[in-house]
C-alpha cells in the first residue's frame, strides 16, 4: 500500500493494483449468501452452488482472472482430505524421477504441498514461492469444483486427475484435521454438529457429493482428459494405479524402468509410512516457503480406510450412505472402482 501527501499536508493512501483487485472481489463477496461454519466466528459464503471461506473465494476469482494454464500442465484435483497429499507426492515423484537420485529426492526434505501449488491459494496469494518461479514446473493442484474451474484450465486442454474417498472417512479426516488448525475463529463444533453440517453440504468447498459428481460427469464426457480415481482402491493396491497415472500424465515407465523396479520405488517413496516418518513432516515443523496454518505433521494422521467406524454411530453412517446412494443413483459412479 502506498501513500502520498497532498498540498494541504493530508495523507492519501493509495491501494496497490493487487489490493484494488482484492477489494473488488471482497465487495462482490459481501453481496453473496452467508452461513455460519464449523466454528463460532467462521462465516461461509455460497457461490456457484458451493460454500467457501472468503479468502478461498478471493483466490478463486484471482485464479479465474489471472491463471494461465498451458496444455502441458497437469492438475491434481480433489476435495479436501481425500488423498490430496499422497497424490501430490506421486505426481511429483513421477514427473521428476529422472532428475534426482533416490537419496536426493526433495520429497525427503520438504512437504509435498510445497511442490504442487494450489491455484486458488499459492498462485493467488504467494506468487513468489519457488515452485511458481519455476516455469518448467507442470504441476498444479486445486480443490475448486469442476464447474467453477478457471477458463484457462478448461480451454487449455491440460490433463487432470481427480481422487475421491468414502464420505464417512472424508468427514472424519477433515474434522480431526481442523482440530490442528491455527484458527482465530473459535473452537471447532462438536462431532455431531459438524457431521450434521457436512451431511447438509455446509462445509468448505462443499457439498462434498456434488463436488465428486461434478468431476465424475466431466470424466464421463472426456475420459482422455480426466483420470478418475478412488482412494480406497488405490490404497489397497497402489502399484497398478501409479503406473496408470504415469502413463496418463505422459510420463509412462519404460521397459528398463519396469525391470529396475522404478515404479515400486515411487510407490515406496510416496507411501504414507515413508512420508509420515520424515523429519520434515514431524512435530511442529512447517513449510518454509510461505506462512501456514497447519504443521506439516497435520497432513499425516492415519491414512487408513474405515477409520470412521471409530467415530460414527451406525445411525450416522447410515445417514451418509443413504445420501450417497441417492446422489449417485443411476450415475455409474458407485460401479466405477478404479
Curated annotation (Swiss-Prot):
Highest taxon of source: Eukaryota
Its EC number(s): 2.8.2.24
Gene: SOT16
Family as reported in the entry's similarity comment: Belongs to the sulfotransferase 1 family.
PANTHER family, per database record: SULFOTRANSFERASE SULT
Job of this protein: Sulfotransferase that utilizes 3'-phospho-5'-adenylyl sulfate (PAPS) as sulfonate donor to catalyze the sulfate conjugation of desulfo-glucosinolates (dsGSs), the final step in the biosynthesis of the glucosinolate core structure. Substrate preference is desulfo-2-phenylethyl glucosinolate > desulfo-indol-3-yl methyl glucosinolate > desulfo-benzyl glucosinolate > desulfo-6-methylthiohexyl glucosinolate > desulfo-4-methylthiobutyl glucosinolate > desulfo-3-methylthiopropyl glucosinolate > desulfo-singrin > desulfo-3-butenyl glucosinolate.
Organism field: Arabidopsis thaliana (Mouse-ear cress)
UniProt record, GO biological process: glucosinolate biosynthetic process; response to jasmonic acid stimulus involved in jasmonic acid and ethylene-dependent systemic resistance
Residues annotated to bind 3'-phosphoadenylyl sulfate: 81-86, 165, 173, 231, 301-303
Reactions it catalyzes: (Z)-desulfoglucotropeolin + 3'-phosphoadenylyl sulfate = (Z)-glucotropeolin + adenosine 3',5'-bisphosphate + H(+); (Z)-indolylmethyl desulfoglucosinolate + 3'-phosphoadenylyl sulfate = (Z)-glucobrassicin + adenosine 3',5'-bisphosphate + H(+)
Reported pH dependence: Optimum pH is 9.0.
Any GO molecular function: aromatic desulfoglucosinolate sulfotransferase activity
Name this protein carries in UniProt: Cytosolic sulfotransferase 16
Reported regulation of activity: Inhibited by phosphoadenosine 5'-phosphate (PAP).
Consequence of changing residue 324 to L: In strain: cv. C24
Taxonomic path: Eukaryota, Viridiplantae, Streptophyta, Embryophyta, Tracheophyta
Amino acid at each position: 500500500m502506498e501513500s502520498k501527501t497532498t498540498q494541504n499536508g493530508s495523507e492519501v493512501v493509495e491501494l496497490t493494483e493487487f489490493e484494488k483487485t482484492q477489494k473488488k472481489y471482497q465487495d462482490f463477496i459481501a453481496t453473496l449468501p452467508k452461513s455460519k461454519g464449523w466454528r463460532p466466528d467462521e462465516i461461509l459464503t455460497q457461490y456457484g452452488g458451493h460454500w467457501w471461506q472468503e479468502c478461498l473465494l478471493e483466490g478463486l476469482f484471482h485464479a479465474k482472472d489471472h491463471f494461465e494454464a498451458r496444455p502441458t500442465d497437469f492438475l491434481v484435483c480433489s476435495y479436501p482430505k481425500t488423498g490430496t497429499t499422497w497424490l501430490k507426492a506421486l505426481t511429483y515423484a513421477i514427473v521428476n524421477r529422472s532428475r534426482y537420485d533416490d537419496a536426493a529426492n526433495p520429497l525427503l526434505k520438504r512437504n509435498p504441498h510445497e511442490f504442487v501449488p494450489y491455484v486458488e491459494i499459492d498462485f493467488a496469494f504467494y506468487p513468489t514461492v519457488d515452485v511458481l518461479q519455476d516455469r518448467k514446473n507442470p504441476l498444479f493442484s486445486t480443490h475448486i469444483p469442476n464447474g467453477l474451474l478457471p477458463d484457462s484450465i478448461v480451454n487449455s486442454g491440460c490433463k487432470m486427475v481427480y481422487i475421491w474417498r468414502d464420505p464417512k472417512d472424508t468427514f472424519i479426516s477433515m474434522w480431526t484435521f481442523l482440530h490442528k488448525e491455527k484458527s482465530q475463529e473459535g473452537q471447532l463444533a462438536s462431532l455431531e454438529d459438524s457431521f450434521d453440517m457436512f451431511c447438509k453440504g455446509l462445509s468448505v468447498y462443499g457439498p462434498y457429493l456434488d463436488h465428486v459428481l461434478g468431476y465424475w460427469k466431466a470424466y464421463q464426457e472426456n475420459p482422455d482428459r480426466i483420470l478418475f480415481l478412488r482412494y480406497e482402491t488405490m490404497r489397497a493396491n497402489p502399484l497398478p494405479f501409479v503406473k496408470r497415472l504415469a502413463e496418463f500424465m505422459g510420463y509412462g515407465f519404460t521397459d528398463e524402468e519396469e525391470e529396475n523396479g522404478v515404479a515400486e520405488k515411487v510407490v515406496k517413496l510416496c507411501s504414507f509410512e515413508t512420508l509420515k516418518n520424515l523429519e520434515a513432516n514431524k512435530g511442529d515443523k512447517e513449510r518454509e516457503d510461505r506462512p501456514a496454518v497447519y504443521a506439516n505433521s497435520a497432513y499425516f494422521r492415519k491414512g487408513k480406510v474405515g477409520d470412521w467406524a471409530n467415530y460414527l454411530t451406525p445411525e450416522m453412517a447410515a445417514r451418509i450412505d443413504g445420501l450417497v446412494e441417492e446422489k449417485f443413483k443411476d450415475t455409474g459412479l458407485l460401479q466405477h472402482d478404479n
